[in-house]
Amino acid sequence: MALPILLYLLVSVIKSAVVLGVLLTAVAYTVWLERKVVGHMQNRWGPTRVGPFGLLQPAADGIKFLFKEDLTPPHVYKPLFLAAPLIAVIFALTSIAVIPFGNSITIGGYLIPLQITDVNTGLLLILGVTSIGVYGVALAGWSSNNKYSLLGGLRASAQMVSYEISLGLSLVGVLIMSGSFSLRDIVNAQGGHFWGFIPRWNIFHGQFIGFFCYLMAAYAETNRIPFDLPEAETELVAGYHTEYSAMKFAMFFMAEYANMITVACLATLLFFGGWNGPLFGPPILQAVLPVFWFALKIFGFLFLYIWVRGTLPRFRYDQLMAFGWKFLLPLALVNLIATAIAVAW
């Protein structure tokens, strides 16, 4: 049964607050996890001082950012300099609104979807919202009136626009197979098993190449190693956020990790069955188990991000652009054509 309008608004506000709180907490502890894992990979301990196992380190870092001196250099173009981090973080956090986290639940006879808003063009909306984030990066580089920031902003803009094409094409194969832009429909199309034991996830259903293209493009879109050229410290000091400090720098930091989580959510929904798990649990856990599987898959992708950061070197800029245009884009086109032929037959 559909919710009355006032109750719908109340439920939407509650869901928005819960999802935003969980997302910001996940951002904070993804940073903690990265420092811990990379520390162990480099034979260090990582955070250990603040709380048990350093678990309160994110809170300490947040307090530090709040109390740091917020400098605005006199040579910057102030309106855009202040707007750039807001643009980056707002659109990074907004994209989570259409991501479903599990099956709809029934409370008091009302069916409530586990997402802030259920739209039938969810995937298209996410691609549109996340692509706007490049404006924050470009404006940060230009408004800083600094050669290193400008080069970092130019690199980020070119990189994100170039890999956006491969990212979009890598998802068309999934759209052809599911026949819908709705993320919930895409997940439902991946329910069940092949031969009773292999999950019907898209990665096992002819979309391995599409997933590879998506993963490579996602690394470039989020400016992460091995594609973190916009922030290459040895070349550009700190890239487009060289002139930023305190909470304005923290906003760019939050935007980067929020985008990582969004990318992990999309990979889970589109290629790994979303909340459909490889194993079934007892009936008493049917309401909780889908959310558990979804969270576990997201954790796996975030761990992969961190693992790659600790093991791979940075590409040169010419290698980055050549890889995107000469290898990844043709490969995504081949996957699209092969999927279309397979579905037509």
Predicted regions and their residues:
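Selective transmembrane helix interface/packing segments
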Residues: 1-345
